[in-house]
Amino acid sequence: MNRSRTSSFSTDRSASTVALAPDGDYERERVSALASWPEYAVDALRSEQDFIVHQSAALWTHRTPALHDPDSQETQLDVAKGLLARERETHGSFVFDARAAHHCAFRSQLVEWILDVCAGERFGPTTADVAIAYTDRVLSKTVVPKTSLHLVALCCLHIAVKYEEIEERVPTMSKLRSWTSNMYSPEIIRKMELAVLIELGWDLGVLTPAHFLESFLALTNGGISDGDDIEHGDAYKERYREELRYFVCQLYSLCVQDTSLLNQPPSQIASAVIATARVHLGVKPMCSPELRAAGNVTPQQIYPLVAHMLKLWDEACAEDEAMDEVETSAEFNSLTIQVPKPIGHDIVSKMGYEHRVTENASPTCPFDMQWDEE
């Protein structure tokens, strides 16, 4: 399968290759689809914002209408308020317990696989985030044999795609099976998907940090405000915005693999990711007035998260001095899913996600129930 990738992330971006954002036809399809979509899906779609990305010798340039359009700003403010209200109502309904979760030993592999598929198929960051959330919820309360973990993740991703993407982006069964080298039959996938939905209680409205990030970036002028103290002066603000967006994408890809962050409010995670990016770039203050207002947070609330995220970043860089070499496959709205390349492993570039499995194909059935295939 052909996929565009970057092999370096450096200050000059000279080797960057970034796929173009969805064109006008895609936008028209998305808007026309709203009329037929369930109400729960419309909320997720409203939080998205299209933009344009293209390759430059020095920068990853983009257009974010909300930065200068009062109407778009008002829309994003409404979206952010709605998301925060939903968070107040739903946060705490699921608590991740790493000691009780049955998949912790394999979670990083499953998360990396989900990120890689979403990057290769150009799915949005919310799709990846929701798929990971579904996987955690199912595997936290259900004993699943190791041989079925990959199948569970596959079905969680399929459900997330149906929930977050437009109908035209939902993969066919043939495509779905190709993600795992056709190791699972259509019948076993359908049965597992039903089992996953039952385990989730058909409650698919999961709110994740990715839902907040785009609105917060729009409401904070791309994370860099007019009153910010930046090292090189106002003339470099656009450059700082682009650097900040890059760092946000990479840092968030590390955060989704950290189980210690799973029980934090999604809005605070999103705010902390942006604040951490500001600290990393030397932008002061850490938490701008715009970010405080957008996320309804105080610096005191997110400082522990910022300190933790900076530690995550430092540890990742220490483990791999070639952290510049980041596997990047596509852009989604104004975020990009980043898949860090494992140290000493070329499996991502050589084989592709279609051949990456956690274990062998399940010899039995979903949740180890003895169902006979037709």
Swiss-Prot record:
Protein keywords: Cell cycle, Cell division, Cyclin
Query: What's a Pfam family in this record?
Result: Cyclin_N
Q: Does the keyword Cell cycle apply?
A: yes
Keyword Cell division listed: yes
Q: Which domain of life is it from?
A: Eukaryota
Give the record's GO biological process terms: cell division
The UniProt family comment states: Belongs to the cyclin family. Cyclin D subfamily.
Q: What is this protein called?
A: Cyclin-D
- Origin organism is Ostreococcus tauri
| Phylogenetic placement of the source organism | Eukaryota, Viridiplantae, Chlorophyta, Mamiellophyceae, Mamiellales
